[in-house]
Structure formats: C-alpha cells, structure tokens
Amino acid sequence: MHLMYTLGPDGKRIYTLKKVTESGEITKSAHPARFSPDDKYSRQRVTLKKRFGLVPGQ
C-alpha cells in the first residue's frame, strides 16, 4: 500500500491509502518521482520551473 492524496475543498491535501475516494475521484501518489542521474530533461524542467515561478525558495 502506498500513501495517496486528494485535494480537499480548501485546497489542502487529504491523505489516504485508497486508490479511489468514496466520491469516485482518483487519488494521486504522495511520493516524489524517483531520481535518475540519466535524466535527459532535467535542464528543461528546471528552466520551465524558474520561468513560471514554481521553484521553491524564490
């Protein structure tokens, strides 16, 4: 079982172990993606995050 989440009405995460909520909404994984040193697109991803202000700490 993996920790999953869905967004509540106030925009905060509601954590669960279920894949689908009672209302039929599909949950998302609460775990980050695995890191790979062979990631070919990390430069583009970082550039886009900086451009749109999505990098934490800025």
UniProtKB/Swiss-Prot annotation:
It is found in: Nucleus, Nucleolus. GO terms for cellular component: box H/ACA snoRNP complex; nucleolus; sno(s)RNA-containing ribonucleoprotein complex. Its main location: nucleus. There is a cross-link at K28 (Glycyl lysine isopeptide (Lys-Gly) (interchain with G-Cter in ubiquitin)). Non-catalytic component of the H/ACA small nucleolar ribonucleoprotein (H/ACA snoRNP), which catalyzes pseudouridylation of rRNA and is required for ribosome biogenesis. This involves the isomerization of uridine such that the ribose is subsequently attached to C5, instead of the normal N1. Pseudouridine ('psi') residues may serve to stabilize the conformation of rRNAs. The H/ACA snoRNP complex also mediates pseudouridylation of other types of RNAs. The H/ACA snoRNP complex mediates pseudouridylation at position 93 in U2 snRNA. Essential for growth. Component of the small nucleolar ribonucleoprotein particles containing H/ACA-type snoRNAs (H/ACA snoRNPs). The protein component of the H/ACA snoRNP contains CBF5, GAR1, NHP2 and NOP10. The complex contains a stable core composed of CBF5 and NOP10, to which GAR1 and NHP2 subsequently bind. InterPro entries: H/ACA_rnp_Nop10, H/ACA_rnp_Nop10_sf. It holds the Pfam family Nop10p. It comes from the Eukaryota. Belongs to the NOP10 family. The modification Phosphoserine is found at S36. Keywords: Isopeptide bond, Nucleus, Phosphoprotein, Ribonucleoprotein, Ribosome biogenesis, rRNA processing, Ubl conjugation. Transmembrane segments: none annotated. It comes from Saccharomyces cerevisiae (strain ATCC 204508 / S288c). GO terms for molecular function: RNA binding; snoRNA binding; telomerase RNA binding. One of its GO terms (biological process) is rRNA processing. This is H/ACA ribonucleoprotein complex subunit NOP10.
